[in-house]
Amino acid sequence: MLTRNWPRHLLCLSLCLPLGSALACGPDFPMRLLDNRGQTLADLPEGNFNFELSRLGKAIAGLNNVTAATHNPNDLYGEENAAAEARDKAEQLGLSADQQTLVKQLRGLTDAHQVEVQGASLPAEIRLYVAGAVAFATGDHQLAVEYFNKLLALPADQRPLRSTWAAYSLGRTWFAMSSEAGDKVVALERSRDAFRQARQLSIDGFSDPLELGVASLGEEARVVRAAGDWNGAIELYEAQNLHGSAVGYTSLKQLMNELAELPEAELAELLQHTSVQQLVTASLVSRQGWSFGDEPPNEKKLVKLLQNSTRGSLENADRLAAMSYQQGDYAGAKAFLENAGDGGLAWWLRAKLAVRDGDKNAAAAAYSKAAQAFPQKEDWGYRRTPDWAYESLQPKCRVEGESAILALQRGEYLQAFVQLYRSNSTYWFDAATVAERVLTVEELKKYVDDNVPAPPALTQQERDNYVPLPVAASLRNLLGRRLLREGHYAEAVAYFDNPDLQNKARLYGEQRLKADSAWWPTKRASALYNAAWTAREWGMDILGYEMAPDYATFGGNFSLETTELTVGPLVSEAEVQRQKASEAKPDQRYHYRFVATELASRAADNLPHTSQAFAAVLCNAAGWNSSLEEQSALYQRYIKEGPYVLWAVDFGNQCPYPDFENADKRYVTQVT
């Protein structure tokens, strides 16, 4: 390949590459633990209400969890008649086509007695159930009770399809009658008995396609709540939630809202019950009802009454400690932690309190125990920070990330990096910062060589579908770019994650090495210019910093606010010096453009000033958008030193390729 055609071939290659995606507005950005280290260590993230509820209550032995048949928590916009359609579909199971048609006809009647007459050909359980359903729909609750009881009185082998249905409907009927009957207490008790029977029938294997066994928990909870038993209602809804019903979750949220509205005296009495205490605690540590950082109106009342009712409590002590810590009651948090045991949350709080007390050794030990105690898969879900960054909170990863802050302060830089890197993508921004700014290139390379093998390259289809790179590939790319920046050209190539990047890195490195070894000035100039062109065209991919100042992690499309790193309680002088030593040169956004311009200037240094190549190199470099100052300096250099050329009228915009071959001849002529 001729030297003068080299960038043209590269241009052809670049035009064949897919264009990067253009975003109309900025994306959400993940939280960075290292952005404000003191705040990170001081704050205890709010819990997740769904996760907190999963810790409460007891599942019913033998009762199956709900399936997709009745549970789709993501379907927020389901059809209003979806429940009726599901019932109609389930009602057809086990029936012949003629029986299905007849049941549909009977459902449309308004006289339950006519159901018995016209449905005489149906099995007794089907006929009795439809008759009871018609009676219920028309408001004849007493007649409905009679039909459902008749069905349940049949021998077990004669009612395999409708036993669970009948018991569940019987419970609903008695609940409706509780507002009509003279003895409300008796009606509610019979309703509760029926729902318990429905649950047991489901456990015993009677047909339950609508999963009424789980639904009965919520219905029974409603009965219990109507009888004034908040504690019992909460326990039933908790069980329903544990069996996978979204109704259990939403009902507990509603109960919590109702509790918050109660007068203080009534709420204080209810808070003597464990289940009420636990529900209120779960809500408070999860900050339910908060909006954009604004505290709900009843929050302080709930906190005060809960603290008054749980002093010295052994139950739920770690959550009570968390609630106290979030409220700024650190003495109260310490008191609860005395009885909080050795769970992950308890040790996390002890670590934070040790940081507050200035005991970093105790904090480090507590963080270590917290990381060991939290399950690997514990997930508190998605949250927003006060500055609207997002965090997918996995406590084990978060604890290790906070521990990394203390490791950095102690000078244990590799340990800090590993703790952040283990979070996978969650705290990648922090891991990347340590990898390219705090670790030496030798430390980083050794870790990658020993622990981060190259993952399989993404297929073209995966790239077309914007499948993100594995974090391992991102780390290896980061190392490859850093090696190129620091002059380790031959070593860098293998770390890039695909052949295209490897080829670009190889071309850049070859031209830099060629420039270093060339003894003839124009050959050196040609190689420097080609390296400069490569740096300008592909610098983000092969030279860019993952984080500041280039933000290769965003393809350079966005940048994040940064603050100058200064020595402080959590930042050592040694770390500051390491970060200064590894900062971009110059420390400007798209720093590789400045690298390209500097290489082009060096190319011009090796060319006869009267040559076309000298003018063309400066002209091209002036169009590389490094800065207005550099553009002006390049033009001024051309004015002072370069030859007159016609295309100088559009300097920096319309520039020919440098004619290095003729420059070589001119150089020989000038020398001789």
Region annotations inferred by a language model:
Residues 2-10:
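Bacterial N-terminal signal peptides that target proteins for export
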Residues 23-150, 155, 159-169, 182-357, ...:
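Extracytoplasmic/secretory-pathway proteins
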Residues 10-20:
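Bacterial N-terminal signal peptides
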